[in-house]
A protein has these predicted regions:
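Glycine-rich S-adenosyl-L-methionine
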Residues: 212-221, 270-294
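C-terminal catalytic and target-recognition region of SAM-dependent MTase-like enzymes
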Residues: 96, 244-260, 287, 297-349
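Short beta-alpha connecting loops at secondary-structure transitions
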Residues: 156-157, 267-277, 329
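Conserved helix-to-beta-strand junction in the class I
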Residues: 175, 201, 287, 293-297
Length: 349
């Protein structure tokens, strides 16, 4: 991992002498692959009958998981396909390789030859059957560094019966504790996991999601439709909801802002600098400022990130306009989950 001294010092503030354990842990995937069952549309038992490799979670009744296996041995072939970081991190978990993620192809034979898939920094992450660059599917992965069910291929996922969501992320909706007739706003709603989870827990609340691009809003609406939920979604820069929409007296707000994603794993490699972290910090504070304007007195904010720096977590929520009811951290090397931070804030009267 290529982190400058500022980032390392911040991580050391969190992890102390265990910083190396943390840095090693983010190179590996979570040992469990979680999905959330849409219990408004199906039952846990019915899904488990169709997905026998999954098991019930110990804490959340709507959560099931499959065990991730590996590391596995990757065969090294003369023919190779080199992919970008994001594609490599998916392929190492067993996902197929599609054209947008391919950076270079070195293949001497015909299509349907076996190839090794490499990250762009030279790490072999998978092997499979090469279909050529003429089609969207470039490599059908047959063996990967780690293996888990290919969720994207499941009809249950395509039809809205299940949703891929990490366990740490599932805590957010539960800690929000949505109640009937409350107005709840998700300020950064895409890709929709927390938004739809809130509705699943409390369909009688008024739930509104915002995101700032038309494409993301369209995808959110597609997700909501296939999950058969009644959620409002609008395109907006949610830092200006009060000014642009005159929204006020909201009961609860979720903020899951853009962040450095240091807690996300597995990572093939990563690079972050002081400027990256401080820019995120300033951006994140703007969402909290907007939440203050639209919340009622004693209204609730659940602030969460998939990163672990103090600058993007504790130093964001330390705001004199709010009282911090609690803060929770999940550590990859301790809890075997994504590195994650959640805080519950109350707007002062």
């Amino acid at each position: 991992m290529d982190y400058d001294e500022f980032v390392i010092e911040d991580l050391r503030e969190v992890y102390g002498s265990y910083i190396n354990e943390f840095l090693e842990s983010i190179k590996k995937p979570n040992p469990r692959l979680y999905v959330r069952v849409n219990t408004l549309k199906t039952t846990i038992d019915d899904v488990l009958r169709q997905l026998p490799q999954f098991k019930r979670d110990e804490d959340f009744e709507e959560a099931i998981y499959a065990e991730v296996k590996g590391p596995n041995k990757i065969n090294i072939y003369d023919d190779k396909v080199i992919v970008d970081k994001k594609t490599a991190e998916s392929a190492m978990m067993g996902a197929n390789v599609y054209k947008p993620g391919v950076k270079k192809v070195i293949v001497s034979g015909n299509r349907k030859s076996y190839v090794t898939v490499y990250s762009d920094n030279g790490i072999p992450v998978a092997e499979g059957i090469y279909y050529g660059m003429h089609s969207d599917l470039v490599v059908e992965v047959t063996n990967s560094l780690y293996s888990s069910p290919k969720l994207a291929d499941l009809e249950l996922l395509k039809r809205g019966y299940i949703y891929a969501q990490g366990k740490a992320s599932m805590y957010v909706a539960h800690l929000l504790d949505p109640q009937p007739n409350e107005t709840i706003i998700d300020m950064t709603a895409y890709p929709g996991g927390k938004l739809t989870h809130i509705y699943q827990l409390q369909p009688k609340a008024r739930i509104i999601g915002f995101d700032h691009t038309s494409k993301k809003v369209e995808k959110l609406r597609e997700l909501i439709s296939k999950m058969q939920m009644r959620i409002e979604v609008y395109k907006a820069d949610s830092r200006y909801l009060y000014e642009d929409f005159n929204i006020k007296n909201v009961d609860k707000v979720i903020i899951d802002p853009p962040c450095s994603a240091l807690g996300v794993r597995p990572k093939i490699y990563d690079k972050k600098t002081k400027d990256d972290i401080l820019n995120f910090h300033e951006y994140q504070k703007q969402f909290l400022n907007a939440a203050y304007k639209i919340l009622k007195e004693r209204g609730v904010v659940i602030y969460s990130t998939c990163t672990v720096t103090t600058w993007e977590n504790e130093k964001v929520v330390e705001d004199p306009r709010f009282s911090v009811e609690y803060e929770i951290r999940f550590h990859p090397h301790v809890h075997n989950m994504t590195g994650f931070f959640i805080a519950k804030l109350i707007k002062k009267g």
